Regions:
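Basic nucleic-acid-binding interfaces
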Residues: 1-142
Length: 142
């Protein structure tokens, strides 16, 4: 989480973004998530983004990223949703059968800024653990 520098600027901006699948359909399996990660890192290389963590559950994804200040959070969401939807539909045509209307992502999203002094490690661990079953900690009577 170092300060990134460029011509006439220095910044340290991190976003936690959640993208739900349209209709909260359960469509994200291992091959789809692997493809999604490949597409995500291609987006990172093309745009001034740094993907710090990507976690997927069966019906939504969490993204922890650092972005150039020229991108508003809404622009990042639009960019990510459009590219990933187009590429996932190309590489996994079976997704189109599950979703009518040609849309992969729901219209809504969640975005929050993440600071290194407060909730960074909590958010990073939460995203990393997406898709894994939580360990049940059930207290039992003797």
């Amino acid at each position: 989480m170092a300060v990134r520098k460029g011509h006439h600027r220095a910044y340290n901006i991190h976003y936690h973004i959640v993208f739900p699948i349209k209709y909260r359909k359960v469509l994200l399996n291992e091959p789809t998530v692997a493809t999604l990660k490949t597409i995500t890192y291609d987006i990172q290389d093309r745009y001034e983004l740094e993907i710090e963590q990507l976690g997927a559950d069966r019906d939504h994804i969490h993204l922890l990223c650092s972005a150039h200040p020229k991108y508003a959070p809404g622009q990042l969401v639009r960019l990510y949703k459009s590219i990933t939807a187009r590429e996932l539909f190309k590489r996994h045509p079976e997704l189109k059968k599950e979703l009518w209307g040609g849309e992969l992502w729901s219209d809504g999203y969640y975005v929050a800024t993440v600071g290194e002094k407060g909730n960074w490690s909590v958010v990073e661990r939460y995203i990393r653990d997406q898709g894994h079953k939580p360990q049940d900690v059930q207290l039992r009577l003797l």
